[in-house]
Amino acid sequence: MAGSLVQTEAGVLQSVDAVEITMNLHSRIGGVPENIQIKLNGRNVRITLERRGCENGELWLLLPALSTVSSRGEWHAFADAMDERCQLVSFDWAGFGDSERPAIAYDANVLRDLLAGILQHLQSADQVKVNIVAAGHSVPIALGLAEQCSSQWAQIVVVAPTFRGPLPTMTGRAGQSFSWVRRLVELPLVGPLLYRLNTSRPILKLMLRRHVWVNRNLLTPERLREQQRISRQPGARFASVAFVTGGLDAASDSQWWLTQIQKLHCPAHVVLANEAPPRSKREMLTLADKADRVSDIDGRLGLHEEFGTLLAQTIVAS
């Protein structure tokens, strides 16, 4: 019966529905997935988290880039290249991937609370420091916790960092200017229709080719189907439209993250995407000026996925 409770092996009471969801989870980075509950906007939201590697090894938390096709699976090649003596952890942001996708007001504060909850969940009794690796638009979410949490970080690596969503980047206008687009896509009937048009395979292919991947051979029909599957899951339109319209932006100008990076209590490593769109590349360079270490890879905004092996080698190189 829906809503009935069962006792798991760990002795935790869960609803039958929750147990079924956990059993149906798939590995995305070659590890073991699990579901946890984190309170966001006054309600518990189911977040899917995955661990890979040695339980007692050096801890690495991998933050997926925020995008219409955001998924922890972006880190699979990176995870394959890392030493198995490390413990790698990644998760799907609320509203994306395998995590719950409720119709809530998504913004940078919600995702910052989510990341703080993940860090608290991972905190061990011996206070082992965590290596943060943040990709793309997840970077300002992590930097938003610089003052609060970074004393517990061994380092933060920011990969092809961005701080503005696509529409604010293209137009130069703040995210508030596009709140009407968010309201439109959130409507019943018309909202799903508009979102479906925006996640057609030709649109996704254009976006991935121009901004995300360098190698066009990656844009196979099978891979495009998988990207479309991620983007069209029930409830996915709410967080996705927030991202596209700048609703997830932590700030409207680069001065904010220049201030935040100076609040860090750990080293910062910026990995530049050499083939990023010009405006995004300029903003990456301003952040790199404040970093302790700078590297560059000939990729675009999805370099952590396309060049995961090279990225892993670059990060661990002394």
Model-derived features: where do they sit?
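Alpha/beta-hydrolase
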Residues: 201-256
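Catalytic active-site module of serine/aspartate enzymes centered on a nucleophile-bearing elbow/loop
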Residues: 287-318
